[in-house]
């Protein structure tokens, strides 16, 4: 029975991996866009962006998933979005808002004197950001970004709310057959994957330790 259970859980876990990977693919760059919006000197854009981030961070991801999937049809009478698409959109927006605050904190932690020094050297704003600021920001945000990435691993289980067959749902199917251990077995998938990510992120953090800016 162990092999069939493992194969079934692997099917569910593959869907969890897809949600995880696609969310990171879209949310990391989108978070930077949101960050720039929240730091904009144009007040209406800045406050609109910060209000949006506040709403997303202050409401449950589960609620956002449900609204993303059912909302367009119930509110605007539009065709339902594919389940996977709704999941990726909701997850990406949610995590982009969290990442944007991490980016903003990293950028704002750089002393103003470094920007001024770049200007004295005749560098453009883009050159100052990419050649002076960026590496220091990356060094400072690796740990908090890592925490959010590990949280995302566990949050993928929320996708089952709108019918995505992820690993925990796969484990629950065996309860109908009188087996409870497959549900505990699903925890091993999360632990192993989270452990591997923790090791990789730890190595990245150590690699950047040489830079103390």
Task: Give the location of each predicted region.
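Transmembrane alpha-helices and adjacent helix-loop boundaries
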Residues: 1-213
